[in-house]
Amino acid sequence: MRSVLERMARAGHAPLHTRSPQDARVAYEAGAGVLEVPKATLARVEDLHIPARDGHAMAARLYAPSTDAGLPLLLYMHGGGFTIGSIATHDILCRELARLAGCMVVSLDYRLAPEHRFPAASNDAWDALQWLASHAETLRADPARLAVGGD
């Protein structure tokens, strides 16, 4: 982590909190590769759409280390203060979580502030969890082993 922070400091860019949400998102996307971790090859990587309570179709990506049925499933909420971040910025991290933990990971593109005010992101997370619980077997996950996490 020290090397990541040092590279960020050397880049000399304005801190994210001093930028507009749009500019911060662009900068965050551009810096997504700062971890320099190779992209893990997984048995399954699938893009999904999960319905929110208001009919909005949330983009999501499922990562699975194997094609075995009955794997535990983690609903992953990317970091970024509910203002920045996306499936793309956390793709490598979610691949590593799936590979190292031996579980499915579903990364959710929840709606971001300030365009979508509270409680949009938490409602999106709850709606996604409910949908995953009711569709776990279709996804080949174990419905008794669901978790929520993120950074």
Task: Identify the residue ranges that each predicted region occupies.
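A glycine/proline-hinged amphipathic helix-loop "lid/cap" segment
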Residues: 1-58, 62
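Structural signature of beta-strand start/N-cap positions in the alpha/beta core
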Residues: 73, 102-104, 144-145
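Gly/Ser-rich "nucleophile elbow"/oxyanion-hole loop immediately N-terminal to the catalytic nucleophile
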Residues: 133-149
